[in-house]
Amino acid sequence: MRHGKVHRKLNRTAEHRKAMFANMAASLIKHEQIVTTLPKAKELRPIVEKLVTLGKKGGLDKRRQAISEMRDIDQVKKLFAVLAPRYKDRQGGYTRIIKAGFRYGDNAPMAVIEFVDRDVDAKGQDSGPVQEKATEAA
């Protein structure tokens, strides 16, 4: 019987799953759109929805709960300062999952998970080292 088996294990230990979803939630809040496998996106959605609800409730205790869940203080600040006011009138359903074909190599089903009414400019922002074009000194 599969009674009580609510979440997917994703072939990872409990610690690995928790860390992975904390990192994925921080990435989704930072970029407001990420590409991942479909099962991971489906498991990430309720985590992020609950984080946005924490942001909407506000308060120091909710901020500390979000920090313990996500472990990225900069993204918690964005959650409470940017995302919470954006979704203050929306009762849930802050994210959407769009199927994005299959990954080359292992044929894994891929998906895009993104915030509804997302900021298009946030995608790819501060996503790692960026080479700046060297200006020629004449």
Swiss-Prot record:
<dbReference type="Pfam" id="PF01196">
    <property type="entry name" value="Ribosomal_L17"/>
</dbReference>
<comment type="subunit">
    <text>Part of the 50S ribosomal subunit. Contacts protein L32.</text>
</comment>
<dbReference type="InterPro" id="IPR047859">
    <property type="entry name" value="Ribosomal_bL17_CS"/>
</dbReference>
<dbReference type="InterPro" id="IPR036373">
    <property type="entry name" value="Ribosomal_bL17_sf"/>
</dbReference>
<comment type="similarity">
    <text>Belongs to the bacterial ribosomal protein bL17 family.</text>
</comment>
<dbReference type="GO" id="GO:0003735">
    <property type="term" value="F:structural constituent of ribosome"/>
</dbReference>
<dbReference type="InterPro" id="IPR000456">
    <property type="entry name" value="Ribosomal_bL17"/>
</dbReference>
<protein>
    <recommendedName>
        <fullName>Large ribosomal subunit protein bL17</fullName>
    </recommendedName>
</protein>
<keyword id="KW-0687">Ribonucleoprotein</keyword>
<dbReference type="GO" id="GO:0006412">
    <property type="term" value="P:translation"/>
</dbReference>
<dbReference type="GO" id="GO:0022625">
    <property type="term" value="C:cytosolic large ribosomal subunit"/>
</dbReference>
<keyword id="KW-0689">Ribosomal protein</keyword>
